[in-house]
């Protein structure tokens, strides 16, 4: 069996002058090409994990291995070249006057030759379907477009893993769907490993596997269908089940023969329409 691309082994961390651990004895793995979502309410420890993965925070106990190597001072810069982090606020990520300049910035810092740089920029912008906006100023873009440009900047560096740290939380529904569709396509077509840090279970439903965090510890782990069966347990820790999951459950209670496993409104409507058409 292939070695996991990410392995977190008994990791604990607490912030300075804090008695309670932000993350305590957390262990999990991620396979190459997997979309793994870490979900939890604010303060559950999920964003602390994201910062440890790129070396911004150092575990007090335990070990983090990425790409088969222990994450430490000697390996952190290599890891950062292979992992891209998309933050919550897209406006905090732009440094260039145009979309093209912004994508070029990280390439220049990594010493990529000019001709190769141009090729990578064109390829990355095509992958996120933003070709018409290459010479736009970032402030003229919508929130979803800005996050797609941020993803393009990461893709130009050709990473093995993308971390989305609440990357859709400030977007409207259309922008959120644009970003998630882009990520799903890259995950499926290029086998880029995706680690999604979110409190939004509708976003997490798109992942292959979920890890639920509560008070710094792993509360549950499984597929979206397995996790959503927890129902009220998730709601008690401040997580809101997707509308389609709640509505599907209520309809089944009323005797409507719906199958389980619907996570989006579109899927639920399609199933209801199919049932109606059979009458």
Swiss-Prot record:
Binding site for ATP: 40-47
One Pfam family matching this protein: ABC_tran
InterPro entries in UniProt: AAA+_ATPase (IPR003593), ABC_transporter-like_ATP-bd (IPR003439), ABC_transporter-like_CS (IPR017871), ABC_transpr_CbiO/EcfA_su (IPR015856), ECF_ABC_transporter_ATP-bd (IPR050095), EcfA_1 (IPR030947), P-loop_NTPase (IPR027417)
Membrane topology: Peripheral membrane protein
Single GO cellular component term: ATP-binding cassette (ABC) transporter complex
Cited Gene3D superfamilies: P-loop containing nucleotide triphosphate hydrolases
GO molecular function terms noted in the UniProt entry: ATP binding; ATP hydrolysis activity; ATPase-coupled transmembrane transporter activity
SMART domains hit by this protein: AAA
Keywords: ATP-binding, Cell membrane, Membrane, Nucleotide-binding, Translocase, Transport
Compartment list: Cell membrane
Chain ranges of the ABC transporter domain: 6-240
Main location as per UniProt: membrane
SUPFAM superfamilies attached to this UniProt entry: P-loop containing nucleoside triphosphate hydrolases
EC number, as in UniProt: 7.-.-.-
Source species, domain of life: Bacteria
Broad EC category: translocase
Function field: ATP-binding (A) component of a common energy-coupling factor (ECF) ABC-transporter complex. Unlike classic ABC transporters this ECF transporter provides the energy necessary to transport a number of different substrates.
Subunit field text: Forms a stable energy-coupling factor (ECF) transporter complex composed of 2 membrane-embedded substrate-binding proteins (S component), 2 ATP-binding proteins (A component) and 2 transmembrane proteins (T component).
PANTHER family to which the protein is assigned, alphabetical: ENERGY-COUPLING FACTOR TRANSPORTER ATP-BINDING PROTEIN ECFA1 (PTHR43553:SF24), HEAVY METAL TRANSPORTER (PTHR43553)
Sequence similarity: Belongs to the ABC transporter superfamily. Energy-coupling factor EcfA family.
Protein name (record): Energy-coupling factor transporter ATP-binding protein EcfA1
Originating organism: Geobacillus kaustophilus (strain HTA426)
């Amino acid at each position: 069996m292939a070695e996991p691309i990410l392995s977190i082994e008994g990791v604990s961390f607490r912030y300075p002058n804090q008695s309670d651990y932000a993350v305590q004895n957390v262990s999990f793995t991620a396979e190459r090409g997997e979309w793994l979502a870490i979900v939890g309410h604010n303060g559950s420890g999920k964003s602390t994990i994201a910062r440890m993965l790129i070396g911004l925070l150092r575990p007090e106990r335990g070990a983090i291995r990425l790409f088969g190597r222990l994450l430490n001072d000697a390996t952190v810069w290599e890891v950062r070249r292979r992992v891209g982090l998309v933050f919550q606020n897209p406006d905090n990520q732009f440094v260039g006057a145009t979309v093209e300049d912004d994508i070029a910035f990280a390439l220049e810092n990594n010493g990529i030759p000019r001709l190769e740089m141009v090729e990578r920029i064109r390829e990355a912008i095509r992958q996120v379907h933003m070709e018409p906006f290459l010479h736009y100023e970032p402030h003229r873009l919508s929130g979803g477009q800005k996050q797609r440009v941020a993803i393009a900047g990461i893709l130009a560096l050709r990473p093995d893993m993308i971390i989305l740290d609440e990357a859709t939380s400030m977007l409207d529904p259309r922008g959120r769907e644009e970003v998630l569709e882009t990520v799903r396509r890259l995950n499926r077509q290029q086998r880029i490993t995706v680690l999604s840090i979110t409190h939004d279970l509708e976003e997490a439903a798109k992942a292959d596997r979920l890890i639920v965090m509560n008070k710094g510890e792993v509360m549950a782990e499984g597929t979206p269908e397995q996790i959503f069966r927890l129902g009220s347990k998730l709601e008690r820790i401040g997580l809101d089940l997707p509308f389609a999951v709640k509505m599907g459950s209520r309809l089944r209670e009323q005797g409507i023969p719906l199958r389980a496993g619907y996570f989006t409104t579109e899927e639920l409507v399609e199933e209801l329409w199919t049932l109606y058409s059979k009458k």
